[in-house]
Amino acid sequence: MNPVIVQKPGFKVAGYGIETNVAEGNYTKDIASFWSHYEGENLESKMYELLNPPKHGEVGLCVPAFDSGNATYLLGVIVEDFSRVTDDMLTVNVPEAEYAVFTTLPVDTSEGKDQEEFVQVIKSTWRYIFEEWFPGSGYVYDEGRLNFEYYDERCHSRADTVMEIYVPVRERAGK
């Protein structure tokens, strides 16, 4: 699984999210709970209706607050500005960065199929990135930038569902 290296300009994301504490280990459970709420309350449709983004695609990202151990997890869409954002939404300005873009292996999530395999493929892709790809690559993780997951039309009830993981990178010193 080789990534594509891209330079991506900064962009704005608006959507719904939660505050969680990474240091206390609640992060994974809190995000799973948020996803259930997101789907149960049909927040995706509401978000598209209110924000009217120029392109289909959801962005999942985590913005850490290093001093407190807290983080904001946001699931949103890319918008041109924040003029249509409502009080119950969160916003993030994602800065320009160089990214290694990984596309997950395809999974069948067509109608009636369990989504758990897709979730596991996403988790295993993250593991691969940090445990296998980074150590053997000419790159290091750029901790000053944000990573994010991107879910476009290729991840909605298809026999070949995939999504992309954008990991900020910079060239390893002495490469």
What are these regions (language model features)?
Residues 1-175:
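A solvent-exposed interaction/effector surface
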